[in-house]
Regions:
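Primarily auto-inhibitory N-terminal propeptides
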Residues: 19-85, 102-105, 111-125
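C-terminal subdomain of the subtilisin-like protease fold in secreted/lumenal serine endopeptidases
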Residues: 146, 267-273, 406-467
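Autoinhibitory propeptides
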Residues: 71-149, 154-158, 336
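Hydrolase catalytic cores
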Residues: 218-221, 241-245, 328, 372-438
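Extracellular S/T/G-rich loop segment that most often corresponds to the catalytic His/Ser-adjacent loop
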Residues: 173, 192, 330-406, 410
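C-terminal outer-membrane/trafficking sorting elements
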Residues: 460-535
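Subtilisin-like serine protease catalytic core
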Residues: 21-23, 40, 115, 155-198, ...
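Substrate-binding/access-modulating region of protease and related hydrolase catalytic domains
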Residues: 158, 163-164, 224-227, 240-334, ...
Length: 535
């Protein structure tokens, strides 16, 4: 990154032949989703089964924001003479590339368009040599990732067998140079835990070329070099999503980020990590101000909050402006409901470069800190090394949370993301006195396990579930009388459609009126879920 946020202190030297203007990016806002061919009754048309199951687990209903943008609107805009680069179902708009900015008046005149925004210029970048990289650390001081893992006591999870197995993570970043050949990712590829890679920048579809930032971040989570290096979440599965446009810095990158996080949601990932941030751009008229850092201005921040609302755990780097004139976190680190991660040194002191909170509206940011000074990672050549930046503390935290998520899923019938994160926040060494640079501080995941156990012990998998019985003859649910009047009850189809949502006031609920076909349904009572077989 250049003028946005350099989230890792590495010096890059790029040698380019030329830059050639090839168009203008715009964001186009639609008024509605009227007459869409998609339906809330059939979310499998636009969400993966895993995405639907995640919503059901956390009690999140499929709603209108999940519906894709109206394809007729998209087609009409395209036929004006522009290229559709990205679509946002959550924000109900599209990112376009126009060769002639004068054509935009025709788009503004369309009856379903409420506004357009210029977001940057597209250039073609030609490389004549590889990236020349120097790092402000001479050599690795400890040979593996032990220090950064033990600092937050994730080894306690590892020792119990929780290494993020079954957890899917999206890494939203720049390029992933050599991730398809790097020996540090041999086990990732061999065990088919590399789920796929996508470019959202409409530039180079080969995400394994040119840029190494994303690959470095990935190695912190899943790098594996026997006796040399072990990532913090080595058994998780990963999507590699490129949203960073390397040739320049424009507002359009926030829209690329939105496309990436929406894809991650629809693919059904459990978590996302992004070591990117946005505040200033090549065109100063696009710059954010600190007052914009309230979670409601940047489209990336709005989308990050929406991802959290849909059950994703989202980790974002705080930024490296602690000693700079900007000083504060940037977008999307200002989003509500996500985990913004600052940096500390091995001794626990804050890294001087780590950006400060709070948000412009006074919320604690960053929430947590992990080791971002002299953090161990694996280079694109497959050699363990170290570097600095909140780009590196964020994947440390994301990987730790992935292990913690596996622990929670294997020990409790149900829980919320809020309960999970609260257990971690409360384990922070400054939880009772949040600090502007470190938030709740350095978490202790051994303590977080205890916190979660205390919180959820009443719904442990060793405890009984709600007593529910389905009588197929009269199509009636019979429910334990002890919980009548105390909880809400929701019945979902396996596709995530809400069949009913009501206050539980009687121990008998007739399903006749719903004409349910024989299938498996998900019943949620309060904070617990269980399957109901209708036949």
């Amino acid at each position: 990154m250049k003028n946005v946020i350099v989230l890792i202190f590495i010096c890059y030297t790029f040698n380019f032949v030329a830059f050639a203007d090839t168009g203008f990016f715009f964001y186009v806002q639609f008024a509605d989703k009227n007459n869409t061919p998609f339906s809330l009754d059939n979310p499998s048309e636009y969400l993966s089964q895993r995405a639907i199951e995640r919503r059901m687990f956390f009690g999140v209903a499929v709603d209108s924001t999940d519906l894709p943008v109206n394809p007729e609107y998209v087609s009409t805009v395209k036929n004006v003479g522009v290229k559709i680069v990205g679509k946002s179902r959550w924000l109900n708009g599209v990112t376009i590339l126009a060769q002639d900015s004068n054509i935009m008046q025709n788009i503004r005149n369309l009856p379903f368009v409420t506004k357009t925004q210029y977001t940057g210029r597209r250039t073609t970048q030609q490389y004549v040599s590889k990236i020349n990289k120097t790092i402000n650390e001479d050599s690795l001081s400890y040979g593996n990732s032990e220090t950064q893992i033990k600092q937050i006591k994730v080894n306690a999870l590892h020792n119990l067998g929780y290494r993020a197995k079954g957890v899917q993570m999206a890494v939203i970043d720049g390029g992933f140079l050599n991730a398809n050949t790097n020996p540090a990712f041999d086990s990732l590829r061999f065990h088919n835990r590399l789920l796929g890679a996508k470019d959202f920048t409409d530039s180079n579809p080969n995400v394994y070329a040119n840029e190494n930032h994303g690959a470095n971040v990935l190695s912190i989570m899943t790098g594996n070099l026997p006796n040399k290096y072990l990532g913090i979440a080595p058994d998780a599965s990963y999507w590699l999503l490129k949203s960073e446009y390397s040739t320049n810095e424009y507002l359009v990158e926030t829209d690329f980020w939105v496309s990436a996080i929406e894809f991650a949601d629809s693919a059904g990932v459990d978590m996302a990590n992004s070591s990117l941030g946005y505040r200033t751009f090549d065109d100063p008229s696009m710059n954010f101000t600190y007052n914009d850092m309230n979670g409601q201005v940047s489209r990336a921040s709005i989308a990050a909050e929406m991802a959290a609302q849909k059950g994703l755990i989202v980790c974002v780097s705080a930024g490296n402006d602690g000693t700079g004139s900007w000083h504060y976190i940037a977008s999307p680190a200002d989003a509500k409901g996500i985990v913004t991660v600052g940096s500390v040194m091995a001794n626990g002191n804050p890294s001087s470069f780590s950006s400060y909170g709070p948000t412009a509206d006074g919320r604690v940011k960053p929430e947590l800190c992990a080791m971002g000074s002299s953090t161990a990672y694996v280079s694109t050549s497959g050699t363990p090394t170290i570097g600095n930046g909140t780009s590196y503390s964020s994947p440390v935290m994301a990987g730790a949370l992935a292990c913690f998520l596996q622990y929670a899923k294997e020990n409790f019938t149900t829980f919320s993301v809020e309960q999970l994160l609260s257990a971690v926040f409360e384990s922070g060494n400054t939880y009772l006195s949040p600090q502007p640079q470190t938030g709740y501080g350095i978490p202790d995941f051994q303590l977080a396990m205890s916190n979660l156990n205390n919180r959820l012990s009443d719904i442990s998998k060793t405890s009984h579930k709600n007593h529910v019985f389905y009588n197929s003859e009269n199509q009636t649910l019979y429910i334990d009388k002890d919980i009548i009047g105390n909880e809400n009850i929701t019945l979902y189809s396996v596709l995530g459609r809400v069949i009913f949502n009501k206050k539980l006031t009687t121990k008998q609920i007739s399903l006749k009126q719903y004409n349910l076909p024989s299938n498996i349904y998900i019943l949620r009572i309060g904070n617990t879920t269980q399957k109901v077989i209708v036949y």
